[in-house]
């Protein structure tokens, strides 16, 4: 049935777009299943883990069909089925032995086979030239990363999407200079990992020493920023910002966080026996006015705790998933995220850089945090505390994490992804059914009200890489509302992220956007501000070439598993 027929028969919500329906049809809907049938399947399965299952099924279904709660891709694909797992990604911790290195390769393969994007921490593996048993010398971490690079490609063959993994290394590691460049298509092909993403873990001590003038560190920092400007990576993981903000239960049990996931929003403990699990879904901020006084964050906590329970049940006895299952049982960490932040601001004619945006930013994320904390306490009393929460009156070590949500934003109504500014006001969205020109719906309404919603106007916007700053029909206030991501002062992105971080117990996927001619000093200052203001990580660095109005907004390097 076509979407219009499904809507007329009550089998699809009115807010579902053609592009969103086609996205769902490509791998989320079961054979013969309608969108509302999928929402019912997911709701019913989640509710089955509670005593009053009919009540919770209806609560979950209502939240989803109202377009308030937006489950992640793996939840829609696999919840209530026997075909896969409903979680988004994992991260593994590699020990300094051949046994651990290859044992974790098997774990990586099994996690990838089951649909997860995988983070890989290599910080414990000795560097190049270090002594090994038998009087030999280590070749360093890069050849082992190459093993994982091959595993990701091999295990995903025949899949609907390629596997995805990101390797992380501390900046103090002796192999760091080579590691920075493992994705550059130059040099020895055997020491390049073109199928892996990569991130660097940086301590406060290192940053302070670099800023105080250490020449070697300054050179390394320059190389990192150059690599980010050129390739978008490496991701940055600020080790002390992460661990200083750990929840009290983590601090009491001395559970350090070494690494993140492939989208840099998950910050959970790992060691060789514990691999973390990303259990994600998002709240739709574009509809904040509808649910701000409702119990939606409470519902989301209960929903995701059930999703995690389904993962625990399904993963029992599955080879390679033992470490992830162990972590899920002990901590029950979940990650409530958001989407539609910029869509919400534009619908209310609020500029991204404004004081009003900051005020709402604080109100929204404090509300989500407070209600989520309330519900995890209720669940602890109802279902008990897991091992890592004993004595803390909570069901989950962590509750919130802001994933990228690119796919989720598309199939949930075509809103802006996560807390990110819109990259372009018009772009081409590619799908299996063809290429569709996607226009910013809020801008389209504004132009219509001005009598300027014409093909010529949209062609001119496309010719300006999605910008409206050249339009004489818009006043300065309207132009400020519709600034694109690279036109916005990047300090505004950092300031908003820093402000909301106090109410987010995990982290945020924060992309930065720069024009090709951006002053290197400006790029440096924005990155330093992220660290100084307490951000836990930085995701991609987007140069102007990536953000074109005539290109799809999603990069091939982004992981659909983790898009919350």
Language model feature labels by segment:
Residues 52-60, 117-120, 159-166, 311-325, ...:
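Flexible, glycine/charged-enriched surface loops at secondary-structure junctions
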Residues 16, 34-35, 56, 81-83, ...:
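Secondary-structure capping and boundary motifs in well-ordered enzyme cores
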Residues 27-33, 42-52, 61-86, 90-133, ...:
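Function-dense linear segments that define catalytic or interfacial modules
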Residues 257-270, 314, 400-564:
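Catalytic alpha/beta core of large soluble enzyme barrels
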Residues 105, 299-325, 329, 333, ...:
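Internal maturation/activation junctions in enzymes
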Residues 1-51, 57, 134-147, 158-255, ...:
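Conserved, charged catalytic cores of large soluble enzymes
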Residues 82-89, 127-134, 474-483, 505-509:
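Gly-rich Lys/Arg/Thr-decorated short loops/hinges at beta-loop-alpha junctions or inter-strand turns
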Residues 28, 43-50, 61-68, 106-113, ...:
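Structural signal for hydrophobic packing residues in well-ordered secondary-structure cores
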């Amino acid at each position: 049935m076509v979407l219009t027929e499904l809507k007329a028969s009550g089998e699809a919500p009115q807010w579902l777009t053609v592009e969103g329906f086609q996205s769902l049809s490509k791998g989320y809907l079961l054979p013969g299943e309608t969108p509302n049938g999928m929402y019912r399947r997911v709701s019913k399965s989640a509710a089955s883990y509670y005593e009053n299952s009919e009540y919770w099924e209806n609560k979950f279904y209502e939240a989803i069909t109202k377009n308030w709660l937006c489950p992640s891709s793996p939840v829609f694909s696999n919840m209530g089925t026997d075909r896969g797992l409903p979680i988004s990604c994992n991260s593994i911790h590699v020990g300094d032995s051949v046994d651990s290195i290859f044992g974790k390769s098997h774990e990586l393969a099994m996690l990838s086979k089951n649909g997860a994007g995988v983070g890989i921490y290599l910080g414990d593996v000795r560097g190049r030239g270090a002594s090994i048993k038998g009087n030999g010398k280590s070749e360093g971490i890069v050849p082992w990363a190459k093993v994982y690079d091959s595993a990701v490609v091999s295990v995903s063959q025949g899949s609907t999407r390629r596997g995805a993994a990101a390797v992380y290394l501390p900046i103090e590691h002796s192999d760091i200079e080579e590691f920075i460049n493992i994705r550059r298509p130059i040099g020895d092909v055997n020491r390049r990992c073109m199928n892996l993403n990569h991130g660097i873990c940086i301590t406060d001590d290192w940053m302070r020493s670099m800023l105080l003038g250490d020449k070697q560190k300054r050179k390394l920092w320059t190389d990192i920023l150059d690599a980010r400007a050129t390739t978008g990576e490496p991701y940055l993981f600020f080790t002390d910002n992460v661990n200083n903000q750990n929840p009290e239960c983590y601090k009491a049990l001395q559970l350090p966080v070494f690494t993140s996931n492939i989208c840099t929003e998950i910050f959970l403990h790992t060691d060789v026996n514990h691999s973390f699990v990303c259990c994600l879904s998002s709240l739709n901020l574009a509809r904040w006015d509808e649910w701000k006084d409702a119990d939606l964050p409470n519902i989301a906590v209960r929903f995701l705790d059930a999703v995690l329970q389904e993962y625990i049940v399904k993963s029992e006895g599955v080879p390679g998933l033992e470490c992830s299952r162990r972590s899920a049982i002990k901590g029950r960490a979940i990650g409530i995220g958001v989407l539609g932040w910029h869509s919400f601001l534009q619908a209310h004619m609020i500029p991204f850089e404004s004081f009003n945006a900051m005020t709402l930013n604080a109100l929204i994320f404090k509300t989500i945090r407070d209600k989520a904390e309330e519900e995890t306490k209720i669940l602890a009393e109802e279902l008990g505390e897991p091992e890592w929460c004993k004595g803390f009156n909570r069901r989950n070590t962590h509750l919130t994490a802001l994933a990228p949500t690119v796919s989720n934003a598309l199939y949930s109504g075509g809103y802006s992804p996560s807390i990110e500014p819109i990259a372009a006001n018009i772009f081409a969205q590619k799908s299996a059914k063809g290429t569709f020109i996607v226009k910013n719906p809020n801008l389209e309404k504004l132009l219509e009200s001005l009598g300027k919603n014409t093909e010529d106007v949209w062609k001119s916007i496309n010719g300006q890489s999605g910008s409206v700053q050249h339009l004489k029909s818009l006043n300065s206030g309207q132009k400020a509302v519709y600034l694109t991501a690279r036109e916005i002062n990047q300090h505004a992105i950092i300031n908003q992220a820093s402000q909301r971080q106090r109410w987010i117990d995990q982290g945020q996927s924060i992309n930065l956007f720069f024009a090709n001619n951006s002053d290197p000093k400006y790029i440096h200052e924005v990155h330093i501000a992220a660290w100084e203001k307490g951000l836990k990580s930085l995701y991609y660095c987007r140069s102007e070439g990536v953000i074109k109005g005539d290109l799809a907004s999603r990069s091939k390097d982004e992981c659909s598993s983790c898009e919350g």
